[in-house]
Design a protein with these regions (language model features):
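Extended basic (Lys/Arg/His-rich) segments that typically form rRNA-contacting surfaces
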Residues: 1-239
Length: 239
């Protein structure tokens, strides 16, 4: 697995070779410093801890500064642990840059979604408005009755309701890397990324294999049709 920490810069759009508009997100990826290296002999598993974004020493706790001073690394604001493929090759103090990814790679990006404050059931969960006529009630955007009467005489757990919306950890999978700029430490990915501008994101190799249809593959057969499942029965039925 390949991984890096970064910040969302914003969204833009590009044109492909066919003239189609593609929405993209620009991410400032790295540089990240290797702060700690974990091994199966000592910790029981192999992993690498990366630090991102320099910060003033006074903004960190003594425990955090002791951890960073032990590694001989300047104060870092964000620390994340990853199970990298080249963990054995990395040493404490090494720099991981945006060029760890290449154009055409597929990645999973995790961030904190935008906060929307206190919202009702319509915006928060996509609930339907109540009827505005025939006794629909005084407030069309309020939730209707959920507790019934004597039985069950309560609201089941997990029912939708008004409340705080956003500021949740969200992962978007299978985004393709369109462009990599090692000099500016920039990644350009196709699609939207959770979070506001300047929000922290982690970029990792996708956990799901992105299947691409091979050229010349026979896509005319529909497995849902009888002819696709059993051609002999279909031919006998058509006689």
């Amino acid at each position: 697995m390949k991984a890096i920490i970064g910040k969302k810069v914003g969204m833009s759009q590009i044109f492909d070779e066919n003239g189609h508009v593609i929405p993209v997100t620009v991410i400032e990826a790295g540089p990240c410093t290797v702060v700690q290296k974990k091994t199966s002999e000592k910790e029981g598993y192999n992993a690498v801890q990366l630090g991102y974004e320099d910060v003033a020493e006074k903004k960190l706790t003594k425990g955090e500064m002791g951890h960073l001073n032990k590694a001989g690394v300047s104060p870092k604001k964000h620390l994340r642990e990853f199970d990298l493929d080249n963990a054995a090759e990395l040493n404490i103090g090494d720099i991981v840059k945006a060029d760890t990814f290449q154009a055409g790679d597929f990645v999973d990006i995790t961030g904190i979604s935008k906060g929307h404050g206190y919202q009702g059931v319509i915006k928060r969960w996509g609930a339907q408005r109540t009827p505005t006529s025939h006794g629909g009630g005084p407030v069309p955007r309020h939730a209707g009755s959920m507790g019934s009467s004597t039985d069950p005489s309560r609201i089941f757990k997990g029912k939708i309701g008004a409340g705080h919306m956003g500021v949740d950890q969200v992962t978007v999978q299978n985004l393709s890397v369109v462009k990599v700029d090692p000099e500016l430490n920039m990644l350009v990915v196709c699609g939207a990324v959770p979070g506001p501008k300047g929000g922290l994101v982690t970029i990792k190799s996708t956990v799901k294999v992105h299947k691409v249809k091979q050229a010349g593959a026979d896509i005319s057969k529909n497995p849902q049709k009888a002819s696709g499942r059993n051609p002999q029965k279909a031919s006998a039925r058509n006689k």
